[in-house]
A protein has these predicted regions:
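Short loop->beta-strand "edge-of-pocket" segments that line small-molecule binding or catalytic clefts
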Residues: 5, 36-38, 66-71, 111
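Active-site neighborhoods of divalent-metal-dependent phosphate/nucleic-acid chemistry enzymes
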Residues: 68-113
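A generic structural signal for short hydrophobic patches within well-formed alpha-helices
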Residues: 12-13, 44-47, 119
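A general structural signal for well-ordered alpha-helical segments in protein cores
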Residues: 24-25, 44, 57-60, 77-80, ...
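Histidine- and aromatic-rich ligand-binding microenvironments
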Residues: 7-8, 40, 93-95, 116, ...
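Short, well-structured N-terminal submotif of metal-dependent ribonuclease cores
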Residues: 1-39, 49-62
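Structured helix-beta-strand junction loops
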Residues: 33-35, 63-67, 90, 108, ...
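Acidic, PIN/NYN-like endoribonuclease modules and their adjacent C-terminal/linker elements
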Residues: 2-4, 102, 106-132
Length: 132
């Protein structure tokens, strides 16, 4: 498997955590070494929003600069809206940002590395490939 892996905010939180999550840290480190990690604006916003200090914010932004960037295009918003509608009809509730992230992973044919169970729910009904 050599495709890009979009790492959700939940995965990055584990990676940047000072304690625990050794397995996911190892996986993300390997993906970074293989130049297979992707980021997108909504994830960057969530990461920077969660920074506790100015230094931490700048460190996150600097760290993300060397990673593959997946832009959000106009059509992605429309596809995310359709996905949100279809998810709701199946009884699955997801935030607007997470619905957009799932849409981007599907549109760019990336695997999505995450620690949020609702992405697994989405992948059961839609072609979202979750990184295992």
């Amino acid at each position: 498997m050599n495709s890009l892996v979009l790492i959700d905010t939940s995965g990055w939180i584990c990676f940047f955590s000072r304690r625990g999550y050794d397995e996911i840290k190892k996986v993300i480190s390997t993906l970074l070494d293989e130049d297979r990690v992707a980021i997108t604006g909504p994830i960057l916003i969530e990461l920077v929003q969660g920074a506790r200090t100015e230094k931490e914010k700048e460190d996150i932004k600097r760290y993300m600069r060397g990673i593959h960037w997946l832009p959000v295009m106009d059509d992605h918003w429309h596809k995310a809206a359709e996905l949100a509608f279809n998810l709701r009809r199946k009884g699955i509730t997801s935030s607007a940002i997470d619905t957009l992230i799932a849409t981007l992973a599907m549109e760019y044919d990336c695997h999505l590395l995450h620690k949020d169970s609702h992405f697994d729910l989405i992948s059961r009904s839609f072609p979202l490939k979750c990184y295992q």
